[in-house]
Amino acid sequence: MATFVMFGKYSVDAVKDISAERTQDATAVIGDAGGQVQAAYALLGETDLVLVVDFPGVNQAMQASVKLAQLLGISFTTSPAVTVEEFDDLVG
């Protein structure tokens, strides 16, 4: 599994529908794409949400990102991530 960080931004309409049920819906979309949420945070500022998610690969991360936008009205910027230790091994 590969780790991805998903940065979410609510649309005006999506803010009106925030609920624990929608959080469960988002988790289900990620699971349906083969992913697993490792951590989720609500933020203040330009980014409203950050999710740390494991997916089998880029295709599944992209699939979940698009489906989340379609279902919830939250746009995501999704980036692959590696630990600092993995990064050091890659560049060292």
Give the positions of each predicted feature.
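Short, well-ordered beta-strand segments in beta-rich or mixed alpha/beta enzyme
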Residues: 5-9, 41-64
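Short, flexible active-site loop motifs that bind/organize anionic cofactors or intermediates
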Residues: 13, 51, 77
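Short S/T/G/P-rich N-terminal loop/turn motif that feeds into the first structured element of a domain
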Residues: 1-32, 36, 44-47, 84-92
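Generic structural signal for residues in well-ordered beta-strands
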Residues: 37-40, 76-78
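An amphipathic, aromatic/His-enriched active-site/gating alpha helix that lines ligand/cofactor pockets
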Residues: 55-82
